[in-house]
Amino acid sequence: MAPGEAIVSVSYQSTTGVSKQLSLEVTVISPFSLTTDVFNPSIWENGTFDEATRTLVTGQYGFGGWQYTDGLDLSGYKTLTVELGNDNESNVSFRLFDKTSYWTKPATYDFGSSRKVVIELNRMIDENGVKIDPSHLYIIGFWSMGGKPIVIANITLAD
């Protein structure tokens, strides 16, 4: 389900044959919300995040992003596209961890001189060639050398 508005309908019939129906309007949010209550600029080292400009500045060798206590299941999607809104001046990479510790080996995608990375979620591997499981991702975000702004333009999932 894509971010936006949706109507959820619930129907129920009791054992005595009484039927009830309820429709709810819900807001579907992205698992990659760029709000200060969800985005953590200081997963490793002290960073800052400006919600209005979508700008992350990590500490030296820092990491900012999202943490999912129960894991995030992206196995139903084919790709994750991450786009920067400025040039990469601090060796920015996008990393996805399928374990709860930051000190494990993630799938790493370097931006290099590009402003965009496209991640094939079912083909993620770590630096040793070990598969990263998209069905339970615990930490996802941006690593950098630090001290330079990283403008997050867009993060999209596609199936």
Predicted regions mapped to residue ranges:
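Beta-rich carbohydrate-recognition modules and glycan-binding surfaces
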Residues: 25-159
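Extracytoplasmic soluble-region selector
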Residues: 1-31
